[in-house]
């Protein structure tokens, strides 16, 4: 079974501004997109790989089997992978 991995969110200058965890990079990118980030660059901790995603979140009606306390509209994240980049140094 795959362990959860940590991915550091990087801004345009390369500063690490947050950490998201997930078994796959896409899972961490969905968490970042749900917080409102659109240009998502995730560096896997312990490696020099940067996974690049384009993210968005849209409001959709709640599912039919949702609990009563859930609001009528909920945020749904969506990401598209643009590629992987290797860093020279961290």
Swiss-Prot record:
SUPFAM superfamilies: Chromosomal protein MC1. InterPro entries: MC1 (IPR008674), MC1_sf (IPR036620). The keyword Signal does not apply. Keywords: DNA-binding. GO terms for biological process: DNA protection. It holds the Pfam family MC1. GO terms for molecular function: DNA binding. Protects DNA against thermal denaturation and modulates transcription. This is Chromosomal protein MC1c. It comes from Methanothrix soehngenii.
């Amino acid at each position: 079974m795959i362990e959860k991995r940590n991915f550091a969110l990087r801004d345009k200058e390369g500063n690490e501004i947050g950490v998201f965890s997930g078994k796959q990079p896409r899972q961490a990118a969905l968490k970042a997109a749900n917080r409102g980030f659109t240009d998502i660059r995730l560096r896997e901790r312990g490696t020099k790989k940067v996974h690049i995603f384009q993210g968005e979140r849209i409001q959709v009606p709640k599912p039919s089997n949702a609990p009563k306390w859930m609001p009528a509209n909920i945020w749904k994240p969506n990401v598209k992978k643009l590629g992987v980049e290797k860093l020279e140094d961290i």
